[in-house]
C-alpha cells in the first residue's frame, strides 16, 4: 500500500486557512496555491535519490551530494492543477510538464477526459500528479489510469484538500500510489463538493463562475 501523508507544517496550515476564506481574492488565492504547492514540494520530493560527486570549492576539492538526475514530470489535472505547477517548478525547474484535461459531468459527477499531453518518455519519469482537490476521486483515478496505460509506474498524487470518499476511491483503485495532502476534510456534500473545503478551486483560481 502506498503511503498517505497529511503535511501539517505550520506555514502550510496558516496559508490554507486563508485560502479557504470565501473573501480571499482571485489574485491572493492564486498566490497561496502556488506557495502551498512549493512548501508541499519539499516533503513530496524528500525521497529523491542522491549520489556523491566530487566538486571543487574556492578552497579545496570535496565530495558532496547531488540529485542523481532522475527524470521528473509534473502532471496537472486541468484546469485547477495548473495553479500548483509553478510552485513545484521553482524547486525542480528541469522537470517536464504534462497535462491531463478533464471536466466533471454535473449530473453524474463523473470525470470526462478531453486531453492527454505528456512527455514522450513518461514511462521513465517520477511523476507528480497535482490537483488542488481530491473530492470524489474520479478525476485522480482516471488521470492515473491514463498514465499507467502509457507505462508510467512511479507516481505520486499531490493535493491541497481531500475528502475521505475521494481518498478511499483513489487508494482502492491505485493502492501503490503515494498520496500527499495538506488537509483531510469531513465529507462531500450532495453536489460532490468537499466540506468545509474551499469551493471550486478552478473558478477561484481563474475568476470564473
From Swiss-Prot:
Give the keywords, sorted.
Allosteric enzyme, Glycosyltransferase, GTP-binding, Magnesium, Nucleotide-binding, Transferase
> What is any one GO biological process for this UniProt entry?
UMP salvage
**Gene3D superfamilies given in the database record:** 3.40.50.2020
Write down the SUPFAM superfamilies for this protein, in alphabetical order.
PRTase-like
User: So where does uracil get bound?
Assistant: 194, 199-201
Give the signal sequence positions. none
Looking at the Swiss-Prot or TrEMBL record, what is one Pfam family this protein matches? UPRTase
Q: What is its EC number?
A: 2.4.2.9
So which cofactors does this thing need? Mg(2+)
Which biological pathway?
Pyrimidine metabolism; UMP biosynthesis via salvage pathway; UMP from uracil: step 1/1
Q: Which domain of life is it from?
A: Bacteria
Residues engaged in binding 5-phospho-alpha-D-ribose 1-diphosphate = 79, 104, 131-139, 200
Q: How is its activity regulated?
A: Allosterically activated by GTP.
Binding note for cofactor: Binds 1 Mg(2+) ion per subunit. The magnesium is bound as Mg-PRPP.
Molecular function (GO) terms listed?
A: GTP binding; magnesium ion binding; uracil phosphoribosyltransferase activity
Query: What reaction does this catalyse?
Result: UMP + diphosphate = 5-phospho-alpha-D-ribose 1-diphosphate + uracil
**Record family assignment:** Belongs to the UPRTase family.
**What's the stated role of this polypeptide?**
Catalyzes the conversion of uracil and 5-phospho-alpha-D-ribose 1-diphosphate (PRPP) to UMP and diphosphate.
User: What NCBIfam families is this protein classified in?
Assistant: PRK00129.1 (NF001097), upp (TIGR01091)
The name this protein goes by in its record: Uracil phosphoribosyltransferase
Question: Its encoding gene is what?
Answer: upp
Amino acid at each position: 500500500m502506498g503511503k498517505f501523508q497529511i503535511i501539517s507544517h505550520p506555514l502550510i496550515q496558516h496559508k490554507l486557512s486563508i485560502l479557504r476564506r470565501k473573501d480571499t481574492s482571485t489574485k491572493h488565492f492564486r498566490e497561496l496555491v502556488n506557495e502551498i504547492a512549493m512548501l508541499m514540494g519539499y516533503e513530496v520530493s524528500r525521497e529523491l535519490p542522491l549520489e556523491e560527486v566530487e566538486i571543487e570549492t574556492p578552497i579545496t576539492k570535496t565530495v558532496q551530494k547531488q540529485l542523481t538526475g532522475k527524470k521528473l514530470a509534473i502532471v496537472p489535472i486541468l484546469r485547477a492543477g495548473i495553479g500548483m505547477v509553478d510552485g513545484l517548478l521553482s524547486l525542480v525547474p528541469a522537470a517536464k510538464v504534462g497535462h491531463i484535461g478533464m471536466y466533471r459531468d454535473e449530473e453524474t459527477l463523473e470525470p470526462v477526459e478531453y486531453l492527454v499531453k505528456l512527455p514522450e518518455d513518461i514511462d521513465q519519469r517520477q511523476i507528480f500528479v497535482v490537483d488542488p482537490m481530491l473530492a470524489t476521486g474520479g478525476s485522480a483515478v482516471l488521470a492515473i489510469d491514463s498514465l499507467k496505460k502509457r507505462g508510467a509506474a512511479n507516481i505520486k498524487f499531490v493535493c491541497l484538500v481531500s475528502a475521505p470518499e475521494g481518498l478511499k476511491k483513489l487508494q482502492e483503485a491505485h493502492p501503490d500510489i503515494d498520496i500527499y495532502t495538506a488537509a483531510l476534510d469531513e465529507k462531500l456534500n450532495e453536489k460532490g463538493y468537499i466540506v468545509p473545503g474551499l469551493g471550486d478551486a478552478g473558478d477561484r483560481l481563474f475568476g470564473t463562475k
